[in-house]
Amino acid sequence: MTERRKMNLAKVSGFLSASFLLLTLLGDTTEACSCARRHPQTAFCSSDIVLRAKFVAVNKMEGNLSERRWMYHEIKTIKLYKGPEEMQDVRYVHTPPIDGACGYFHGGPLKEEYLITGRVKGGRVTISICNFIRPWAEITLAQKRGFTSEYSKGCSCSIVSCHSECSITSDNQCLWTDLLRSQNQSYFQDKHLACLPRAEKNGMCTWKSLGTQRSGSFRKRRLTQ
């Protein structure tokens, strides 16, 4: 093999290595992002941090090549419902790239109160479109009660999403049937109920109304729909 051919191969190899590194850092921008809808109690229990805050500004993040595509949102924390004690006053939430990485871009009005759930990584709060992020004004009174005090009591329970025929397999489960087409997408369980352990039933998890209805009216049903 001639020296020139060796040099050309070395250049090609170097280019491919650099390209692979770049793609690794930037990620696959063609990858579609999809998130399954979750009951707000599931969103609460699976999150590292839950807070009520106002979005103040959106900025691009400074940093190395892998970080430049991230953004951070400046927020004003109003109330921390769940999270580390040292994060009582979160000022920034970070989000991954918008294209294909489930990044969250706040397109709503600024200085409006939002309920925000997220993860804590390396002392940094991160959010995505898969997190429960919703205007506080759109959250029902029952959901507000849930985020404030009740959902935390049911984190030992498991809410099972029911898209078709389904049934529970243990006493710590509640069937979430809002996603069935027959329910006409009213999302009643989402908006008004919490899955909580009941002392009088030896810790068995059942649906409980967080609204004005009688608490025993919406107990868990052992459905086989």
Residue map of PLM features:
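Transition segments tied to proteolytic processing and entry into folded domains
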Residues: 2-225
